[in-house]
Amino acid sequence: MRFAWTALLGSLQLCALVRCAPPAASHRQPPREQAAAPGAWRQKIQWENNGQVFSLLSLGSQYQPQRRRDPGATAPGAANATAPQMRTPILLLRNNRTAAARVRTAGPSAAAAGRPRPAARHWFQAGYSTSGAHDAGTSRADNQTAPGEVPTLSNLRPPNRVEVDGMVGDDPYNPYKYTDDNPYYNYYDTYERPRPGSRYRPGYGTGYFQYGLPDLVPDPYYIQASTYVQKMAMYNLRCAAEENCLASSAYRXDVRDYDHRVLLRFPQRVKNQGTSDFLPSRPRYSWEWHSCHQHYHSMDEFSHYDLLDASTQRRVAEGHKASFCLEDTSCDYGYHRRFACTAHTQGLSPGCYDTYNADIDCQWIDITDVKPGNYILKVSVNPSYLVPESDYSNNVVRCEIRYTGHHAYASGCTISPY
């Protein structure tokens, strides 16, 4: 009985090994091709989809942008015949049913069609060789870059593009940035409430994703071109009176709504020509809401206006502090607006202007009590130096004003260090 079981098991094992095994070709994948000779197609990747087997064949894929033809490549002579031959990169995606027949015919023809190209840096190198002799056993080494040769993207990037390792679309000198429709720009709250021991400085967040400092410069020609005198009734100056934009005589008890004030109006345009955003000196949670003008004031004193006597340099009109809503009104070509007059995005980007026309509230000096004569209009931006700048010597504009009692003429507006 024991002999019978042994004989039965032996026959089953022999059947499993010899007779009962199905043809190996029915379950085995198509054999891989042997190592290709130099210049032939090589199988890189093989996969199956919907019952069909696909192969990725290549002589060595690489990307080469269009460049000038090398004059020595087509020059006749023995030297050209012995020059290193670079195989032309071709990348094919074919069905494996017809790939076997085409590989045998396409290999020699593609190798013969290879043309020498000038040596250059390449973005992607796979199976690339600068020599005509290529060992079949080094197909894996072809996919690696030599230690001394570092692939670069220099021939793919737009010219003069600046690398940015900060927040998305943040480089002010990058004309290819996209910030208009980018919801993640300035995603981090740089105006969070400072914690004890924090190293925040005035202008919260300027050192977080920017390099350098801002530099505000007022436009003297903009002021000189649009300075004029206007008379307005007190009932039209209620919001201005609320923000202390008038002389002290306007707040007397005997002043009526139909009394007029004489205003020296002028515009202002401030440019940030630095390398960092000019951000408000106050954190966002302390911004003040002004119901008359329906916006937040993020700085107590962004500008200061004074009227000085031309001979004595004494103040003849009561200047006032102008606290504005900072925003990018316009920008130079290649720059984009990134700040607006809202509750959380106030500031001034590099290469952009914050413009205040002469017809808006508080863009004036109340000269109701000033006599006709020659004066100096002094306009200062960031007068208290609350926000760090790279240069404070260009923050003041001085203009010569000739006031006749009904008209004012501005001339000689220049940047001044004081």
Swiss-Prot record:
The protein's Enzyme Commission number: 1.4.3.13
Cofactor note: Contains 1 lysine tyrosylquinone.
UniProt enzyme class: oxidoreductase
BP GO annotations: blood vessel morphogenesis; collagen fibril organization; peptidyl-lysine oxidation; platelet-derived growth factor receptor-beta signaling pathway
Residues recorded as bearing 2',4',5'-topaquinone in the entry: Y356
Domain of life: Eukaryota
Keyword terms: Copper, Disulfide bond, Glycoprotein, LTQ, Metal-binding, Oxidoreductase, Secreted, Signal, Sulfation, TPQ
Cross-referenced InterPro entries: LOX-like_protein, Lysyl_oxidase, Lysyl_oxidase_CS
Cross-link Lysine tyrosylquinone (Lys-Tyr), where in sequence: K321-Y356
Residue ranges annotated as propeptide in the record: 21-169
Compartments it resides in: Secreted; Secreted, Extracellular space
Region spans: Lysyl-oxidase like: 214-418
Assembly information from the UniProt record: Interacts with MFAP4. Interacts (via propeptide) with EFEMP2; this interaction is strong and facilitates formation of ternary complexes with ELN during elastic fiber assembly; this interaction limits interaction of EFEMP2 with FBLN5.
Sequence similarity: Belongs to the lysyl oxidase family.
Name of this protein: Protein-lysine 6-oxidase
Naturally occurring in which organism (per UniProt): Bos taurus
